[in-house]
Amino acid sequence: MSFQSINIDKWLKNAVAAQGFKKMTPVQANAIPLFLKNKDLVVEAVTGSGKTLAYLLPCFDKVTRRDTDETGLGALIVAPTRELATQIFNVTKELLAYQPDSLDGGKKLVADMYIGGKGTLTNDLASFREKNPSVVIGTPGRLNEMLSHISSKHLEILILDEADTLIDMGFQRTLQSIISQLPKQRRTGLFSATMNDTVSSFLKIAGLRNSVRVSVTVTSKKIDTRTPSSLAIQSLVIPPIYKVQCMIHLLCTIEYEKAIVFFSSCASVEYFNSLFLTYKLPFEIVALHGQQVQSNRSRNFEKFKKSNKKTVLFTTDIASRGLDIPNVDFVLQLDPPLDPKSFSHRCGRAGRAGRAGVAIVLLNDGREEEYEELLRVRKVPITRIDTPIEALDLSRLKVLTHELRKIVSKDRDLYDKGLRAFVSHVRAYTKHHASFIFRIKDLDLGQLATAYALLHLPKMPELKDTEISENIFKKFDIDYATIPYRDQVREQARRRRLEVEKTEPKKLARPAKIKNEAWSKQKEVKEKRNTRREKRKSKKEFLKAQKNEASNNLKQEIVSKAGAQETENDDLIDEESDALSELEEDYRQLKKSKKRKNQASFGFSM
């Protein structure tokens, strides 16, 4: 189905044609005609399927055709991240550039973007009043603030892009506040790559009671999947001691224009970006994560997007959803995502719009290998790379590890960042939603520390009762106090602190425990300890009883309320249980799959 066959304004058809789009994707062919017929839509489609144009074209067409006396805000588009909002705004500007100088009724469209972390609310309100935009794109927090100061009575369309991410990131209450400030007589479009129970329960709150559902999946060899057929998803099982070095091996040997590497924490992104900038690899590295200041985030995102040479983006899940970055051929997940739902979104940064792509996830050998079956249960087709470990040239990987540790031993900034990255990775590992697969007690922390090129192990609770063999992790032979900062200002400040510590007396330490203390004294201390323990226990039981009573009162209050308010509060209470039920169902399906495999291996018939 071509864009020329749909009933939209001529200038929009010209704009799409000028961008090189001739035929609509399946999601566009299904969604656009329904939107033009004033239907509320709930659209589920795989990443890279053209969802942005599927809502922008109807938005522009409807706002253009408004009555002449209706001016001001006509369409509101909400995105979960600043990067996605910026991307939508850029596409919007490209399309609106094809507007003729004068439209029927003189209603030329103006678009603007408002996101957090960039300017103040006062500046954004001034910009809104000056430009009087008919199409507004932004992130939930800033849009919610602005709506209490501007008029939205002529709003025609509300779009929630990447709706599941909006909810997963904790924006549900903010979205409710936004929706409560908008006119009820509007069209609403909810677009998402996945449709889980939490999103489904949010539909009524969003005013989508009689919506039309559009679900576009990829069918390949009679198997429905949630990823593009042009994307090859693979796993590589490897001991954690070689994980980081294997990442470098893959980035240096696989053919690609642009690649994205996903880490589990911002600290890991910072550390490995700094480390490999020093190591000088044969490609450019750009870092992007949520703890960067907005100016750096925007600059780095644009740098990676516009790069015309071999470039790798080190990032977190901030770049896993919705972003359309051209020429990304390869996605590597050093760490699987904490939420299994994010896996397909990460992979989907490659293989967009029919372009061939490869996505590889590195799994630790052992229990993590079950992650492959969990993904298949979730309709993500994944195949294992059967490359033997020996083929990776282990001697070269060991040399690389030693070289990285030597670099760290000469730069205190890297030394500090490495320890923070290791700690943050271990703590993130304990927060995996699929905890029946990712268990901290099964993770070889000594091997992981070696892969991170640490000089010594940090002090942390997870290592308290763990014995690390010197064959696995050996401390680097150096006086850690002598490691300097490359930045002379920081190094001089550090040395001044050391001098002060030497000259000033140390703070009085807690008195050491007397081992041969009198028995009567020990008994008295023990009795006091037991008394305190009983008090804490009583207080805990009292608070628990109060919490249960408050919960029961809340449930009774919710039951007594009617209509939409009842549904709204019920959904908020059940949100966590929905997510838990989904994971429990995954676990049951995983056990069934393993059972069928075991029976098949012993020749039993089902």
From Swiss-Prot:
Pfam families (UniProt xref): CTE_SPB4 (PF13959), CTT_SPB4 (PF23681), DEAD (PF00270), Helicase_C (PF00271)
Statement: the UniProt record of this protein carries the keyword ATP-binding: yes
Protein keywords: ATP-binding, Coiled coil, Helicase, Hydrolase, Nucleotide-binding, Nucleus, Ribosome biogenesis, RNA-binding, rRNA processing
Motif (DEAD box): 161-164
One GO cellular component, as annotated: nucleolus
Annotated Basic residues bias: 529-539
Main location: nucleus
GO terms for biological process, alphabetical: rRNA processing
Subcellular locations according to the entry: Nucleus, Nucleolus
Keyword Flavoprotein found: no
Catalytic activity reported: ATP + H2O = ADP + phosphate + H(+)
Xref: PROSITE patterns: HELICASE_ATP_BIND_1 (PS51192), HELICASE_CTER (PS51194), Q_MOTIF (PS51195)
Residue span of region Disordered: 521-574
Xref: Gene3D superfamilies: P-loop containing nucleotide triphosphate hydrolases
UniProt motif Q motif: location: 1-29
SUPFAM superfamilies: P-loop containing nucleoside triphosphate hydrolases
Family classification: Belongs to the DEAD box helicase family. DDX55/SPB4 subfamily.
Domain remark text: The Q motif is unique to and characteristic of the DEAD box family of RNA helicases and controls ATP binding and hydrolysis.
Purpose of the protein: ATP-binding RNA helicase involved in the biogenesis of 60S ribosomal subunits. Binds 90S pre-ribosomal particles and dissociates from pre-60S ribosomal particles after processing of 27SB pre-rRNA. Required for the normal formation of 18S rRNA through the processing of pre-rRNAs at sites A0, A1 and A2, and the normal formation of 25S and 5.8S rRNAs through the processing of pre-rRNAs at sites C1 and C2.
Subunit structure: Component of pre-60S ribosomal complexes.
Protein name, per record: ATP-dependent rRNA helicase spb4
Species in which this protein is naturally found: Schizosaccharomyces pombe (strain 972 / ATCC 24843)
